[in-house]
């Protein structure tokens, strides 16, 4: 899609011109370092700007995609048509009573660290999750026995019509690595986490232990999308992949990690196509060997490259 001067001018009036980028490479904004170009990449600085961008996209019938920190996401090599919005400039975190409130663009790691600084327990599990707060709600992110569902009290969202609503955690239908946010078309603006007062040294001890486990077991030296597959009932995805002798398997620059079989790393300037093909190869091999269908935890969006 060629971006018209009219659309560019309209978006530049909503936010500053420096926040509107045409033909922006999405790989520069994802943890996997994969993905083609966004027709328009925009980073609003207020909730009202978010509303106005959505309303403009609806009025002009322009496709619209929300992008978080890109930590659990693969964007195809053909990129994304229309408007891609990132809330990285809405990243404030603060305390109110025994609650931590964080804007969507803040990293969930930083929300966890703020809770530690305020001697509030409950977000320790998130100390190693690299995604944004909005992305964490989108997929009910979790690790080491904890998940967003355990601590989320409420959230402020923008609807696909551009209206602001406050929702309780129950209204998001949070479940294992899922929510109703994508189906409803909500855009998360901020989240309120209900925590408990605790001794900061005890909180730090838990976080240090989880950080050690993460750093010792995960291939953090290479770009990746984190855990690729959901945990199948009765199994562990990483163990199935390991027992299928897939560790070290490569397609192009993508490789099944030798350190943690549940990770696929971008070891040598992989394309999104190579990365996705390796995911499919792993799924096919595990299915044939064990009869287990591995379901992706990572989202894949965008268009295939033009041949």
UniProtKB/Swiss-Prot annotation:
Residue stretches making up the FAD-binding PCMH-type domain: 34-198
Names of required cofactors: FAD
EC number(s) per entry: 1.3.1.98
Annotated metabolic or biological route of this protein: Cell wall biogenesis; peptidoglycan biosynthesis
Annotated catalytic residues: 177, 227 (proton donor), 297
Reaction catalysis annotation: UDP-N-acetyl-alpha-D-muramate + NADP(+) = UDP-N-acetyl-3-O-(1-carboxyvinyl)-alpha-D-glucosamine + NADPH + H(+)
CC per GO annotation: cytosol
UniProt keyword list: Cell cycle, Cell division, Cell shape, Cell wall biogenesis/degradation, Cytoplasm, FAD, Flavoprotein, NADP, Oxidoreductase, Peptidoglycan synthesis
Enzyme class name: oxidoreductase
Subcellular location: Cytoplasm
GO molecular-function term, one example from the UniProt record: FAD binding
NCBIfam families xrefs: murB (TIGR00179), PRK13905.1 (NF010480)
Name assigned to this protein: UDP-N-acetylenolpyruvoylglucosamine reductase
Gene this chain is encoded by: murB
């Amino acid at each position: 899609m060629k971006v018209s001067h009219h659309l560019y001018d309209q978006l530049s009036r909503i936010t500053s011109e420096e926040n509107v980028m045409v033909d922006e490479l999405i790989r520069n904004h994802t943890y996997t370092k994969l993905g083609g170009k966004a027709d328009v990449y925009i980073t609003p600085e207020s909730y009202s700007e978010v509303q106005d961008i959505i309303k403009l996209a609806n009025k002009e019938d322009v496709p619209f995609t929300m992008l978080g920190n890109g930590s659990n996401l693969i964007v195809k090599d053909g990129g994304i048509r229309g408007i891609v919005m990132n809330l990285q400039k809405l990243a404030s975190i603060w305390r109110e009573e025994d609650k931590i409130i964080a804007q969507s663009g803040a990293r969930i790691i930083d929300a966890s660290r703020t809770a530690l600084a305020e001697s509030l327990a409950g977000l320790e599990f998130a100390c190693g999750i690299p995604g944004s707060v909005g992305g964490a709600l989108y997929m009910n992110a979790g690790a080491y026995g904890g998940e967003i569902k355990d601590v989320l009290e409420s959230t402020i969202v923008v609807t696909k019509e551009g209206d602001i609503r406050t929702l309780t955690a129950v209204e998001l239908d949070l479940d294992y690595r899922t929510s109703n946010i994508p189906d409803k078309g909500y855009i998360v603006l901020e989240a309120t986490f209900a925590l408990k007062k605790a001794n900061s040294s005890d909180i730090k001890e838990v976080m240090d232990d989880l950080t050690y486990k993460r750093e010792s077991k995960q291939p953090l030296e290479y770009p990746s999308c984190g855990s690729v597959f959901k945990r199948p009932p009765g199994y562990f995805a990483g163990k199935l992949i390991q027992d299928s002798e897939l560790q070290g398997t490569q397609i192009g620059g993508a490789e099944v990690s030798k350190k943690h079989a549940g990770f696929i790393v971008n070891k040598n300037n992989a394309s999104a196509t190579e990365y996705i093909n390796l995911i499919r190869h792993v799924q096919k091999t595990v299915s044939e060997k064990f009869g287990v269908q591995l379901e992706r935890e990572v989202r894949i969006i965008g268009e295939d490259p033009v041949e």
